[in-house]
């Protein structure tokens, strides 16, 4: 399967809410939209309309990754995932693997350390080693679910990305451009730094002179 950004966000939210707030699951379109647009625990932060979420839901429904549920006496349609661990799902994941996949769908590429820190509401990992073991299991499949990204400069750990969405291919194509942009930005910053410092020193000297003058005037008025 290859999910779009919006589809991945919808699936990630349904996986998350099923675990963290089971009393509110399945989710209505309004609740699902709010979950997709959360300002915390989401990367990137999105501002999807209900129409955009509905389009993603309809697409996932056609892919048989979501099902609709209507309560007795209620006209509100609610949605639940069929992504994994249901009688209709080919994909069966352990609680640990589900937590990792869910976090990667919601927050993009992350290191094992980040995954352990952020997973406490989804699954309690004993340590980073347990996270790394689970990552290896998800990678060492006939059809891998995750892959390791090249280690970035300044990072001690490599990041991992899920392979259910188009995110990994987009990252690969974006990395060279991003790297060159970073180098250019650093070069410009280094060239501009002396000029900025000189300007700042001049401004501070002027402020000190003005304060000194005001202080002298105040002393003179009091004497």
Curated annotation (Swiss-Prot):
Protein origin, superkingdom: Bacteria
Gene3D superfamilies assigned to the protein according to its UniProt record, in alphabetical order: Winged helix-like DNA-binding domain superfamily/Winged helix DNA-binding domain (1.10.10.10)
InterPro entries found in the cross-reference section: DUF480, WH-like_DNA-bd_sf, WH_DNA-bd_sf
Record family assignment: Belongs to the UPF0502 family.
Classification via HAMAP family: UPF0502
PANTHER family documented for this protein: UPF0502 PROTEIN YCEH (PTHR38768:SF1)
Full protein name: UPF0502 protein Shew185_1758
Species of the source: Shewanella baltica (strain OS185)
């Amino acid at each position: 399967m290859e999910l779009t950004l919006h589809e991945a966000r919808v699936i990630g939210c349904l996986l998350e809410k099923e675990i963290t707030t089971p009393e509110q699951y399945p989710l209505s379109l309004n609740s699902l939209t709010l979950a997709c647009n959360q300002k915390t625990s989401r990367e990137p932060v999105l501002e999807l309309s209900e129409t955009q979420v509905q389009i993603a839901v309809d697409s996932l429904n056609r892919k048989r990754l979501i099902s609709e549920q209507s309560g007795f006496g209620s006209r509100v349609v609610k949605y639940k995932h069929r992504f994994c661990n249901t009688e209709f799902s080919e994909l069966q994941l352990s609680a640990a693997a589900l937590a990792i996949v869910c976090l990667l769908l919601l927050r993009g590429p992350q290191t094992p350390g980040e995954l352990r820190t952020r997973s406490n509401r989804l699954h309690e990992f004993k340590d980073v080693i347990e996270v790394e073991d689970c990552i290896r299991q998800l990678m060492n499949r006939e059809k891998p679910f995750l892959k390791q990204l090249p280690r970035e400069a300044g990072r001690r750990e490599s990041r991992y990305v899920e392979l259910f969405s188009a995110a990994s291919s987009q990252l690969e194509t974006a990395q060279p451009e991003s790297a060159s942009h970073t180098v250019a930005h650093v070069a410009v910053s280094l060239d501009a730094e002396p000029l900025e410092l000189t300007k700042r020193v001049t401004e501070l000297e002027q402020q000190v002179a003005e304060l000194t003058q005001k202080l002298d005037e105040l002393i003179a008025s009091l004497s």
